[in-house]
Amino acid sequence: MANSYFNENTLEELIEEIKYVYKSDDRPWVIGYSGGKDSTTVVELVYKMLLGLDPEDRHKNIYIVSSDTLIENPLIKIYLSKMNDLLGQAADRDGLPIKSAMVTPPPNNSFWANVIGRGFPTPRMNGTFRWCTDRLKINPSGEYIQRVIDEEGKEVVVLLGVRKAESIARKRRIEGRELANRLLNRHETIQDAYVYNPIVELTTDDVWDVLLRCDGGRTPWGSDNSELVSLYADADSGECPFAGIQAGGQTQSCGNSRFGCWVCTVVKEDKSLNGFIKSGHRELIPLAEFRSWLMSIRDNEEYREKKRRNGTVYRDKQGNMGFGPFNWKARKLILRKLLETQQVMGYELITLDELKAIDEIWDQELDLSRRVLVELYEEITGEKLPWYDSVSYTHLRAHETDQYL
């Protein structure tokens, strides 16, 4: 393969490098694991490295952390949960110092708590109001790493599945770090953390080569990487082969899709969600329909306040008056449609903890009855929320709020 890392290096040499870094100090490792091809490769290489060590040399803990934004594509969330369970079981079986964890945003700062509870407009396609990434993914992972630092009482090394070929922006950051000519680099935001990118030199083809050709595509924790290939292929509408021939005889590997949040409005089209649907996962159609509807109401003045949450009026560079958060009408409507979609799918799209957080936000900010949310939930699902009987009619009954719509 042209430009392959393995043209001049062997897999054994790569694992030896990882072993060298592991044994060089007593700093615990934290691996960011998304379930995608790159992070899976990192976890697989590290796991194999540990298996090759004598038990007495496995002298420090390795924490594998996955991030669940609570709005993950259901297929990806199910797969990731399965992999985390298998990893934990296999590590116990093999006596490895591996601990796996799944982090989520706190219920009162989740996507739905901010959109439905506080009325945050959904993130823009141009990225000017992309409030979600830090709250849903970066902060929960960062807080987890900080807890590891505090509990271990020492610095940590964070392993990432970043590669040179991934993007121009990432390439700039990687090459900038290489100027220091060392394997470990200071973490950009966490003071007592370093970063190690073990597969930085691997191409996409190299990654698939590791995943599919080593041990017949079986992971050390008992899964089959062909399942991962199927996920990528389905996300590409089922038309993505492992390696397809391009013009000039070059090959392009399957697996360039990214699995984002199913309700993400930063992109005009969710290619992976639509790809899954085209590949036969028609159970996801309600998600695509809800996402399209949510995008359609974002900039409709009927559903927006005139002022920002801090009471100021926003004007763009041309002096045009902008909108504030989603108004009460929009928030209640979004919740209704989300619950209806959840009923159709038979899959949890919003947790009870998030609903409780939204209930409390509405009570604090909107001067409305605590009964609004619990009665709406009962109307749509036919079930009572656990705190149904503990909230009182402090203001109006749910149906009496219609005068505000």
Regions from the PLM with identified roles:
Residues 1-30, 37-397, 405:
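Nucleotide-activated chemistry modules centered on ATP-dependent adenylation/adenylyltransferase
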